C-alpha cells in the first residue's frame, strides 16, 4: 500500500 500524506513516499 502507498499513501500520499507527506511522511510516506507516495
From Swiss-Prot:
Residue numbers carrying Pyrrolidone carboxylic acid: 1
GO cellular component, as recorded: extracellular region
Coiled coil region boundaries: none
One Pfam family here: GnRH
Keywords of this entry: Amidation, Hormone, Pyrrolidone carboxylic acid, Secreted
Family, per entry: Belongs to the GnRH family.
Name of protein: Gonadoliberin-2
UniProt organism field: Gallus gallus
This protein's encoding gene: GNRH2
Amino acid at each position: 500500500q502507498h499513501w500520499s500524506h507527506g511522511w510516506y513516499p507516495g
